[in-house]
């Protein structure tokens, strides 16, 4: 789903026209809301990706990763796990080796700006951004309109809670004691 389709669907949901003039009037505000929604989903679901970067002086710089890094989960070189610690600066991590390493990390998507940009989250989650945008719009309106915001928040929140069951870190999984054999 592209940014323009997110904005168009959000405008239709709140009962506004989706002509070119309306799109221009609402684009900046709804783009901010859509970017906030994509980042909220990525943070809540603890979305991960793995990218290869080069370690120099036994350190990696998380600014070399293509997306904003919330947390480094693992570092590997040639398929072997590496231990890692904080480096000598807030953006450095000691990995104890030089060369290319694969970094698995929790990320935040890049901001959308152009009409054809897509949220940097899995495609099947894109539809959740629309109720988030509508929720944010209702929350910035008059008190009568704010009362309707809860309905859109519930729709968004249910979708992200349902998605949480299949995303995230190990703390989302449970191990049950099956007893002694």
Give the ranges of each region predicted by the language model.
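Internal mixed-charge
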Residues: 1-9, 32, 39, 80-181
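Long, hydrophobic N-terminal alpha-helical segment
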Residues: 1-31
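A short secondary-structure junction motif
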Residues: 13-17, 44, 110
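Short secondary-structure boundary micro-motifs
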Residues: 15, 57-59, 104
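Divalent metal-cofactor coordination and adjacent catalytic microenvironments
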Residues: 28-83, 122-139
């Amino acid at each position: 789903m592209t940014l323009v389709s997110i904005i168009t669907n959000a405008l239709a949901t709140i009962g506004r026209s989706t002509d070119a003039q309306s799109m221009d009037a609402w684009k900046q505000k709804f783009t901010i809301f859509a970017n906030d929604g994509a980042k909220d989903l990525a943070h809540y679901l603890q979305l991960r990706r793995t990218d290869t970067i080069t370690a120099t002086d036994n350190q990696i710089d998380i600014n070399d990763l293509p997306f904003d890094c919330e947390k480094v989960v693992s570092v590997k070189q040639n398929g072997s796990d590496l231990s890692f610690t904080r480096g000598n600066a807030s953006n450095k991590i000691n990995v104890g080796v030089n060369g290319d390493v694969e970094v698995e990390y929790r990320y935040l998507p890049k901001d959308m700006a152009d009409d054809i940009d897509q949220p940097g989250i899995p495609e099947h989650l894109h539809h959740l951004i629309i109720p988030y945008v509508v929720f944010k719009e209702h929350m910035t309106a008059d008190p009568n309109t704010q009362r309707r915001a809860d309905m859109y928040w519930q729709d968004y929140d249910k979708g992200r809670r349902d998605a949480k069951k299949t995303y995230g870190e190990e703390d989302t999984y449970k191990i049950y004691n099956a007893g002694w054999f």
